[in-house]
């Protein structure tokens, strides 16, 4: 990791997901991957543009369809962790059953007891280990993956979302295929253990629209191609935060009632359109964690706004805050434009706010509109400079705030953790 990545961290990605592909020709053929841009990734898998995966390159299985996604990952690294665990449930520590853990503990206790009762036990084991080393080394073989049915994928996904590690993440399941959702529902109704309440199910695409499954920011995209993957999705929220914090004279924390200095302190802003609540980051997080009554919780998931009393999601606030605190150049340009208009029209007080809002809105449109993915918002190489590549859209290399790179993308080989069941 170079120094520039440490000094200039990127904003939290507005969208990152793990997806499940299904062949429209052979429904038993399934594939797992991760991406910040599901629409582009799907056309890559279908061979429309270069950059697809070897395991989805067979023409006899194309076209592929994206039937569901697990969204809500706060980084590329987090999505890769979930992707690998879903691809390799036999080796993932997150999916080890309690029975296996108990057997391992019993074996460990027996080993310790044998060592304490027999002093020569350790020497004999060392000798046997040395004899094995002297023998002919075994050739490494590719790990065999047993065939997995759709129900097996559901089971592994269900176990992952209930695991100690992933159950505290703000993850959601979004179905794009109606028959896949019906299969999930039929499978889920037979399971005794329910998913924890934070995990939401969103019906999208060809699924029937049921309002009970959606709410807040969990809106329907209408299809994979309409996924909201840029900061344009929260443009109004960013606008409001900029206006509230631009003049910090009367900005106070609604938790501690202390003065806020936005240029020196991390400040949160309520995402509700009509609420002007501002808080110190630590004050609000402490309030949310205390209200959750979960002793092991460090990062809050959601909470009640101290001003408007609406339930607000912590990840959404952190995305806006990360953009405001890390995309310095974009914010400076927006504020300079706003203040220039304020000075020109300062005499007409009734026109100042509306003109400024229109100007900022246009500027945000330029920054977050249809060309946003050609700047830095969808640069897939920014997170932690990972050397280990996955199927997860590692083939596009774009630099922040530069001219759009050519759309020709290199073909990448699947990593050893890529997964597809071709039956």
UniProtKB/Swiss-Prot annotation:
Just give the chief location class. Answer: nucleus
Q: Where is the composition biased (Basic residues)?
A: 131-147
Family note = Belongs to the SLX1 family.
Q: What protein name does the entry list?
A: Structure-specific endonuclease subunit slx1
Record's Pfam families? GIY-YIG, SLX1_C
Main enzyme class: hydrolase
- The organism is Aspergillus fumigatus (strain ATCC MYA-4609 / CBS 101355 / FGSC A1100 / Af293) (Neosartorya fumigata)
Q: Where is this region: Disordered?
A: 114-147
InterPro entries in the cross-refs:
GIY-YIG_endonuc, GIY-YIG_endonuc_sf, Slx1, SLX1_C, SLX1_endonuclease, Znf_RING/FYVE/PHD
Gene Ontology biological process terms, A to Z: double-strand break repair via homologous recombination
* Keyword terms of this UniProt record: DNA damage, DNA recombination, DNA repair, Endonuclease, Hydrolase, Metal-binding, Nuclease, Nucleus, Zinc, Zinc-finger
Where it sits in the cell: the answer is:
Nucleus
The record's gene field reads slx1
